[in-house]
Amino acid sequence: MRLQKGLYYISLQVCVDITMDVVAMLVKDIGLNVEDDYTNIKKLLKHDVITKDEATLLKQYNRLRNAIVHKYDKIKLRSCKRRFKKN
């Protein structure tokens, strides 16, 4: 069970990493300088590439990824599942 939870967290982290890479590519594609994830999300919102709801969701995913990276063993799997089921 512990290994399964670990794989779940790693999968979430990788998905968010890939998503943030796509965000950075979109920022570059519209001719702007790529910065940190949160700034990149704000730039896409400002230039109407994404909606406010999409920006909020991307920020939530990014926070979740950061929590996974920094507090890997302290995150409750149930909490992660609830957050993703909402979306």
From Swiss-Prot:
The family classification in the record reads: Belongs to the HepT RNase toxin family.
Q: Where is this motif: RX(4)HXY motif?
A: 65-72
According to its UniProt record, the EC number is 3.1.-.-
For this entry, the protein name equals Putative RNase MJ1548
Gene Ontology cellular-component terms listed: toxin-antitoxin complex
Instruction: List every position bearing O-di-AMP-tyrosine.
Output: Y72
- Give the multimer and partner information: Homodimer, probably forms a complex with cognate antitoxin MJ1547.
**What positions constitute the catalytic site?**
R65, H70
Annotated GO MF terms: nucleotide binding; RNA nuclease activity
**What's this chain's function?**
Probable toxic component of a putative type VII toxin-antitoxin (TA) system, probably an RNase. Probably neutralized by cognate antitoxin MJ1547. Neutralization may be due to AMPylation by antitoxin MJ1547.
- Fetch the Pfam families from UniProt: HepT-like
Species this chain originates from:
Methanocaldococcus jannaschii (strain ATCC 43067 / DSM 2661 / JAL-1 / JCM 10045 / NBRC 100440) (Methanococcus jannaschii)
Task: Name the enzyme's class.
Answer: hydrolase
The entry's keywords: Hydrolase, Nuclease, Nucleotide-binding, Phosphoprotein, Toxin-antitoxin system
This protein's source sits in the domain of life called: Archaea
Q: How is it modified after translation?
A: Modified by cognate antitoxin MJ1547; probably at least 2 successive AMPylation events occur on Tyr-72.
